Structures are given as structure tokens and as C-alpha cells.
């Protein structure tokens, strides 16, 4: 006898949802007020990325690669990255300088589940703690939910990486826990902290970003009046 298709009223199950897959990420160009995101191209971006990233070796402390001894080894690494579809790599252009100043990727791509992760984020010192850096995260989240059609957007990091954990909360990701002994990176143990944002949360997160970016949220010196973390209501828990 085949199992019944009927489910007992006493047995809790998930709600039924549309099973159409999400789109896969690919080449794109998204222009913001402070930053532009475009597909990583070693010919266009290698030189300015190297100049942006070469002096701060701490950028690579929690990564599975880097730091790089010279521009040649960095360029070889970029060449290897751009042939991959997962992760799919993008360059971050600082509109103020028109120079590539960082890299982000979309990775762990599962279209059937409509789940995707943002990761491998490397911002040069000139991009860190700027409105451009925050705008990149807004533009990527908007693209993931509104263009690609994902229902879950993930952020994962080494559990020891306190700045990344703070950034995830500030941006509106919810802390979900730690996977112990999850990976071995550069010969060292990595416990991984997991964060997520889901499609039902995105309208409120989007509104928080847009309120934060509003000109009236910054004084004449450029200092924020209300923090993005406060607007998101996620200032603890990870």
C-alpha cells in the first residue's frame, strides 16, 4: 500500500509555497549613489584592486586564501576566481574615486531551495566604514530578493571574526547559531557563525536601509544621527 497523501491534523508540517526556482546570479552592473557593483574582470580591475588591498594583510586573516606576496600572484588568483560560477565574483567600484576598492561574491547557490549566501567580502581600507560599503550590501540584498527571487539570504563567518558578526547584525541579518568545528582553514579550526535574512523580512530591512541613507540622517559633518543597527532593531544576539 502506498503511503497516504493525507497528513494527520496532529502532525505539524511546513506551509505550502511556490516551488519555482530562483534565478542564478551572473554578470550584472548595479549603480548606486556611492558604489557600483559589476562582474569581476581581471583586465579591468586587477590593478586598482591590488592597490586597494595590498597593504592590509589583516583583510585575509579569516579567508581561505591570501594574503598575496605580489601583484602577479594576486592577478593569478583573480583569473582563477572569474571562471567559477559558484562563487560568482563581483568588483565593488567606489563612485567617488571610480576605482575598484573591494570584492564580494554570491555563493552556496541553491536555486531549487531559493537560498544564496553573500561571502568572500574584502573591502580595502578606503571603502571600509563608508556609505559606499553599506550601499553595496543594500544593493546586493535588493538584487537577491527582488531580481533573483530568493527566499533566504545567508551570511556566514568565522565565529572569531567579531567585525563580521557585528556587520551582519547591523545590516539586518539574524544570528542563528554556531556550527562547531565546521571547517579547516589554513590549517586552523573554524567554527562558523550563521546569520540569515528571509524574504518576509526584506521589506522592513529595505525600509531601514533607505531611512539610514536619507540625507536628513546625516549632519553637516557626515555623521549619522540614527544607526542602521538601531533601525534594524538587531543590536545584540551575536
Task: Describe each model-derived feature in a short phrase.
Residues 133:
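Glycine-rich acyl-CoA binding loop
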Residues 146-156:
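Conserved GNAT acetyl-CoA-binding A-motif
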Residues 167-168, 195:
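Conserved active-site tyrosine of GNAT-family acetyltransferases
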Residues 140:
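Flexible ATP-lid and adjacent glycine-rich G1/G2 motifs of the Bergerat
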Residues 155-164:
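Conserved beta-strand-loop-alpha-helix junction that forms the acyl-donor binding cleft
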Residues 174-188:
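Conserved catalytic-core motifs of GNAT/GCN5-like acyltransferases
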Residues 1-130, 143, 147, 188-193, ...:
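GNAT-family acyltransferases
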